């Protein structure tokens, strides 16, 4: 088989139709899956010895949240090293990163796999992966044809990365010195709320404004602070963290501003405070609403004049520090109640950011679950950690009052429980592995009244075909076991499968 000019033109056109990079990438992947007739396809970006999914088709949604470290995925490492088309034999001993992640085929191993590394010049920037359930699925395509596909995808990805870099530079102040690239914190989520938050982070990071980050406990406010710092001109300098809620009143001032020897009992030497440590960098004050009014006044002075005084010292020290503050309180209410200074609130909230709670982020919960599943897989040395359909349904309908932190702990606990109930190094997370309070789940989709588009015979055959497929998937394509599950004779099952087009 060879690609026609029309096929290649269609791929190129799809790359131009999208409004944004994400839309273009999704169109590319969807078109490729149709053209190559594969069961699953993915476009991955390469960054710091890991592949990050940008768009997928035919794979479970949680794949978008996973981060595939090369040391944990030998097939992806082989693709990264190859420099050309990589075809993995059906009996390859290297585990496929997508085993168990093709919906409806969770219990089956991927058979056919092709990897296409994507380059910009001599630099690896990403990869295309194509997977199929049949061992010879991609034999009809030559390496040269697959290289054409890779070239189109590489061009699209390279242009997107270049535009992203230029847009980031254009947001920098005109007199800012270009800074060395720093590994960026990954903020996982494609919901409207997270997309807007990422845009706001990109805008404010390039400035030197103080930022107030608000959000419920466990939403990831510290991660937002890291993302702001890493995308700022101060990225090569320190990001210093201080949890104001954990500060005893007796040492709070010393922690912030430092002290000199003999300033108080126990001050046996001079000590720098967090502001000095963060000089020319960023200071992140977590739970700032917990600071006393007296300390708020001293913090305000630093923000106004840029100088500090160590405890026990009359001299002032100049510091150049950007302050990022976070709170899970409504500071406006705290101001009205007299527990927080209005002038400090206005100094801090020049550019306020609000981190949405997990219950308002829709399918982001599945992406984050995928991320934590992959983390657990690497930490525990497992071959795979997969979410069942029931587990995904449960996660999507639980409110998560503890937000992302609660989800992380729930995934880790579920992996440990699942691992204890089955042998081997493969873990499938079921709904019963999650100890959530009662969750009201919607009725199964099958309970909905379908729109009739077939006659009775066609509908019956479609139902039989899907039932046999699911039974085969659950029994690793063992026809005898499948027949036992369906309570039918194996010979009759073979004849029915042939009539339904499931067997040659």
Curated annotation (Swiss-Prot):
SS bonds (residue pairs): none
Pfam families in UniProt: GAF, Sigma54_activat
Keyword annotations from UniProtKB, A to Z: ATP-binding, DNA-binding, Nucleotide-binding, Phosphoprotein, Transcription, Transcription regulation
Binding site for ATP: 215-222, 278-287
Residues that bear 4-aspartylphosphate: 57
Alphabetical GO biological process terms: phosphorelay signal transduction system
UniProt pathway annotation: Nitrogen metabolism; nitric oxide reduction
Gene Ontology molecular function, alphabetical: ATP binding; ATP hydrolysis activity; DNA binding; DNA-binding transcription factor activity
DNA-binding region (UniProt annotation): 479-498
InterPro entries linked: AAA+_ATPase, GAF, GAF-like_dom_sf, Homeodomain-like_sf, NorR, P-loop_NTPase, Sigma_54_int, Sigma_54_int_dom_ATP-bd_1
Occurrences of domain Sigma-54 factor interaction (ranges): 187-416
HAMAP family on file: NorR (MF_01314)
Function: Required for the expression of anaerobic nitric oxide (NO) reductase, acts as a transcriptional activator for at least the norVW operon. Activation also requires sigma-54.
Name used for this protein in its record: Anaerobic nitric oxide reductase transcription regulator NorR
Organism: Escherichia coli O139:H28 (strain E24377A / ETEC)
Lineage of source species: Bacteria, Pseudomonadati, Pseudomonadota, Gammaproteobacteria, Enterobacterales
